[in-house]
Amino acid sequence: VISIIPV
């Protein structure tokens, strides 16, 4: 799984 979550 590839998740991109800019936090």
Swiss-Prot record:
Statement: the UniProt record of this protein carries the keyword NAD: no
Compartment annotation: Secreted
Record keywords, A-Z: Antimicrobial, Fungicide, Secreted
GO biological process entries: defense response to fungus; killing of cells of another organism; negative regulation of interleukin-2 production
Cellular component, GO, one term: extracellular region
Keyword Secreted: yes
Main location: secreted
Job of this protein: Has antifungal activity against S.sclerotiorum (MIC=32.4 ug/ml after 288 hours) and B.cinerea (MIC=10.8 ug/ml after 288 hours), and weak antifungal activity against F.solani, A.fumigatus and G.candidum. Lacks antifungal activity against P.ultimum, T.viride and R.solani. Inhibits the production of interleukin-2 by activated CD4+ T-cells with an IC(50) of 167.3 nM. Lacks cytotoxic activity against human peripheral blood mononuclear cells.
Protein name in the entry: Colutellin-A
Source organism (scientific name): Colletotrichum dematium (Anthracnose fungus)
